A protein has these predicted regions:
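Phosphate-handling substructures
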Residues: 1-43
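Short hydrophobic/aromatic-rich motifs at helix boundaries and adjacent loops
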Residues: 8-9, 69-72
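Generic detector of bulky aromatic hydrophobic side chains
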Residues: 13-19, 67-68, 78, 118
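Acidic, low-complexity terminal tails and accessory targeting/binding regions
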Residues: 50-61, 73-148
């Protein structure tokens, strides 16, 4: 179980485990997050260490369409936490909506906060049920639902 390895909870160590090294997780994580930082910089928010400088504060809206796994990588980068607890402890169904906004609590320093995560209210409003595809079996004996 991954939960027995404390490095998986550390934002600087999770990709140094044998399992993550075998899939080049550090390189992929850094590739994705550096491109994300480039996008944010183009919109006026430049990463400096563990925070973002608001060099051109604005109210731009950036819309990203991505897989849950990438969503957790981006959120973990913004929050400086390991993506492992996000991947295993959260669920964003297909077509769900997550809303992140900036707050400039201190002049020139931007914080990112999640206003909603995995919202599916638009599906319910349209009379649709959210997909079970993002989830695993609720009980092990249910052979109709996905198992690990």
């Amino acid at each position: 179980l991954w939960t027995k390895e404390l490095r998986y909870y550390d934002p600087e160590e999770w990709y140094h485990t044998d399992a993550m090294r075998s899939i080049h997780a550090e390189e992929e994580f850094k590739r994705v997050t550096s491109e994300f930082d480039r996008l944010l910089a183009a919109h006026g928010y430049e990463r400096e260490g563990l925070y973002y400088r608001a060099v051109r504060p604005n109210r731009d809206t950036i819309v990203l369409f991505c897989h849950f796994g990438v969503e957790c990588v981006l959120l973990s980068h913004l929050m400086h936490v390991s993506p492992m607890p996000l991947w295993h402890g959260l669920c964003a169904a297909p077509s769900s909506v997550t809303t992140i906004y900036t707050e400039e609590r201190r002049q020139g320093i931007a914080s990112f906060r999640a206003g909603t995560f995995g919202d599916v209210s638009h599906l319910y409003a349209a009379g649709e049920e959210p997909s079970f595809a993002a989830r695993f079996c609720e009980t092990w004996d249910n052979k109709e639902e996905r198992h690990d």
